[in-house]
Each structure stands twice: as C-alpha cells, then as structure tokens.
C-alpha cells in the first residue's frame, strides 16, 4: 500500500486512528507513507508499530517511511547523480521468506513548487502572466521528475524483483512513468485496475499515485482506498503473487 496522508498540516495526531484503521482494513504486508511531519511521527507510528514491527526509522525527518511485516534493510534517500542533491526517491529492500524485493518509495517533485521551492498552485493564479509562469513551471517540474525516475530506474538490477510505489505527481503515459517502464516495471493499475482510478480530485481528478512492479511479481488485485477526507490523496492497495 502507498498513502500520501497530507500530514504536513500538523493534523495527523487527530487523524492517526482513522488512518491506522484504513490501513488495517486492508492489512498490507508493506506500507509506504508520505507527507508525514516530524512533529506527528509518534501519533501514527505508535499505532502502526503494533502491526508492523519493521520500519525505516532513519527517514522520519524526510516525511516518507516504509513499514513492513517482514524485515527491511536500512533505507536510504537517493541523490541525483549529476547534482548530488537529494531527490524524492527512497530505497529499501524487503526480505520476504527467502526472497529479496527491492522497494522504491516515491514522492516526486510537484508542479506546485517552483525552482526556489516556493509553493505556486492553480488557485493562486491572478493574471495571464502567472498563467504562463505556471505552465513553464509544469515543464520544468516534469523534467525534474524524469531525472528522479532515471535515478530510481538505475537502482533496479536486471532480474530483480522490484516494486515502485507512491506519489509520482505524474499521470499514466507521462515521460516519468515511461522511464520506470523502461526499467522493466509495469503499471499495476493499467494492468488490473477498474476505471479511471483517480487518486486526487482537486483541481481535477488525476491518478498521480502509482504502484509499479517487475514482471516476475504477478498482480492479483489493485484497489483505490478512499481517504474519507483524511487526505487530499486516496491510497493505493495491491496484492501480488511471486
């Protein structure tokens, strides 16, 4: 399961029981959570640790975490190979029985931030100049996401069982997803989902959260998990056979 819980607004302490119940309802073996603020870590972490004894605790200050029922390697946040800057991709290996599954948790760069990391949203646009500026920013952010995806793709050795999951901030068919597909990953929703599969609904419905898998992991089912107002994103849940 992957879930952007919109936790940077400081409200997770109140929402934690509902988020935990949503996750528990599906009982996934692995959960990747994004937008998890440092001050709210304990509220949800305490609940999840009852069900998930393994977690990537060293990522707590980065707002993205893995939780697992199976042992996890020490997670690492990847860096851009050219600039050396940290990117929104987190690597971790899960040890399931006698197999190793590579996990790539993603929270890729948003269209709603410019090169100075200043938040700019469609709702804040006031004139034609800002429309053009936002369109240019979309192009710049898209290129940045492609580079993030390229870095992630390099971490998938040939023949490796792998899952990529999270908020990619990009849609099916985008260059970002095509980069990951070129590394041998398949779009789980495209393969087995029902309907459009939007995971955000404002300002327009889009599927920007994705689970992608290597071909040796056979998809059994994939579902949208309604956030029920807890987050601006719905979660994604998938079942695989290997």
Residue ranges with predicted function:
Residues 1-47, 64, 242:
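N-terminal, active-site-proximal structural segment of metallo-dependent hydrolase catalytic domains
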Residues 3-5, 36, 108, 167-168, ...:
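Active-site metal-binding loops of divalent metal-dependent hydrolases
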Residues 104, 141-165:
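His/acidic metal-ligating clusters that form di-metal
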Residues 153-162, 168-242:
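Metal-dependent phosphoester-hydrolase catalytic domains
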Residues 1-9, 100-109, 131-135:
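Active-site-proximal beta-strand elements of phosphoester/diester hydrolases
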């Amino acid at each position: 399961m992957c879930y952007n819980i919109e936790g940077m607004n400081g409200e997770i302490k109140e929402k934690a029981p509902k988020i935990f119940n949503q996750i528990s309802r599906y009982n996934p073996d692995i959960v990747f959570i994004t937008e998890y603020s440092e001050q709210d870590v304990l509220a949800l972490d305490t609940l999840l640790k009852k069900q998930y004894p393994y977690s990537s605790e060293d990522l707590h200050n980065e707002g993205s975490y893995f939780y697992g029922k199976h042992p996890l390697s020490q997670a690492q946040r990847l860096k851009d190979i050219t600039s050396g800057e940290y990117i929104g991709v987190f690597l971790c290996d899960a040890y399931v029985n006698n197999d190793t599954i590579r996990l790539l948790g993603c929270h890729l760069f948003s269209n709603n931030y410019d090169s100075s990391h200043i938040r700019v949203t469609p709702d804040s646009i006031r004139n034609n100049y800002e429309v053009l500026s936002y369109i240019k920013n979309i192009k710049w952010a898209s290129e940045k996401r492609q580079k993030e995806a390229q870095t992630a793709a390099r971490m998938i050795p040939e023949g490796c069982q792998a899952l990529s999951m999270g908020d990619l901030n990009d849609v099916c068919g985008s260059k970002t997803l095509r980069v990951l597909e070129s590394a041998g990953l398949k779009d789980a929703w495209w393969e087995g989902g029902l309907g459009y599969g939007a995971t955000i609904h404002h300002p327009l419905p889009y599927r920007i959260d994705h689970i992608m898998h290597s071909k040796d992991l056979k998809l059994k089912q994939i579902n949208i998990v309604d956030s029920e107002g807890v987050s601006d994103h719905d979660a994604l849940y998938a079942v695989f056979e290997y």
